[in-house]
Amino acid sequence: MIDDFAKDCLHEELNDSRAALVWKLDGLCEYDIRRPLTVTGTNLLGLVKHRATGEARYLGEVFGRPFPEPLPRWQDADGSDHWVTAAETREQIVDFYRRACAHADATIRELPLDAPGHVPWWPRPHVKLFGVLVHVLQDTTRHAGHADILREGLDGRTGVLAEQERPADTAARAAHRAVVEQTALAAIGAVPERR
């Protein structure tokens, strides 16, 4: 009974993080979803591609349930699972993610939390579905957080889900940012702290 509750809870949280990640693409042009937004080249559509590949591998291959399509190379020298070629469309990548999630969902539904798996690239490769599900949830949530920050840097939009988004008060945000900046400068002695 507790296993069913735990599985349902983890799966629901995973679905929320998946939705948040994909939502970060909404309303952006092709350039903004693809361009590198960090010094390491992190980009919004690449995060979705990376998570699609991760779900297909961790909640597919690891449990002897290979994804039925070819997958991008995994952690290769050029990071091909982290960025999108000019020939790959937004729709293709989002559809790939949805198919990978559906495949992963079947694994979650059909296997018990103590189902054994094998992650050959981990130091302790013998795993259970519970541990892998926690890992996938953690990784998806982390990347959804990356996407949230990247999106905020592009157009100021923040939040977890579209239905919870509130219009931005740009004046209040600017005032808050100025206070934080002033405090940071005061901390290093560059300006006196305001009280």
Locate the predicted segments by residue.
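Helix-adjacent hinge/juxtasegments
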Residues: F67-D105
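Acidic/His metal-coordination segments adjacent to aromatic residues that form catalytic metal sites
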Residues: I2-D3, S80-Q92, W121-F130
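Amphipathic, well-packed alpha-helical segments that form the structural scaffold of globular domains
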Residues: V22, D26, D105, R109-P112
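Short, contiguous alpha-helical
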Residues: K7, H11-L25, E30-D78, V119-A186, ...
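Long, charge-rich low-complexity segments
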Residues: E91-E110, Q182-R195
